[in-house]
Amino acid sequence: MRLLPEAALEVRPVRLQMVATAPSVAHIERPVYARWGYDYWQQRPDGSVLIGGGRDVLRDDEETDQQVSTAQARNYLMSLLNDLAVYEPITHAWAGIVGYSASGQPWVSQPREGVYGIGGYCGTGNVVGTLLGRSLVELFVDGDSQTLRDFGYLN
């Protein structure tokens, strides 16, 4: 990890990639997480479809901190779109870097005095990151955090 060297042994960067299509006549009823969350998609109100995934199929190529969309990922995602009967052109493609922990559990640590680190949410940072961030604030302000205790981060 670039921001906190102590996290490098616990959290590794992983690239997640997505594409968006032009509005589609296909109907996708609800957001979907398929293949244990490796693939995911949803349709926006305007009919466009957002789809991401393939990290496990692309394997080692995705264990990187390079935030670029690749042709391999776009091809994989286009094949998923075809399986969903979505044939509209791709209008946008992007990639983002997230942290994955070796244990599958978020990394929470105080590696040195006055420094705390949280990360390695394995793709759930939008929810778990907020929860753990608030829990650290609770620890700083109140001297304790029941949430951190419940997750086993405090004795």
Which residues fall in each region the model found?
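Short, glycine-/Ser/Thr-/acidic-enriched flexible segments
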Residues: 1, 24-26, 56-57, 113, ...
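Short glycine-/acidic-enriched loop or helix-start segments at secondary-structure transitions
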Residues: 3-6, 30, 61, 127-128
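C-terminal catalytic lobe of FAD-dependent flavoproteins
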Residues: 36, 79, 83-155
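Active-site lid/adjacent beta-loop-alpha segment flanking the redox-cofactor pocket in flavoenzymes
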Residues: 10, 27-103, 110-111
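Central helical "cap/lid" subdomain
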Residues: 1-27
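Proline-rich low-complexity regions
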Residues: 1, 13, 30-31, 106, ...
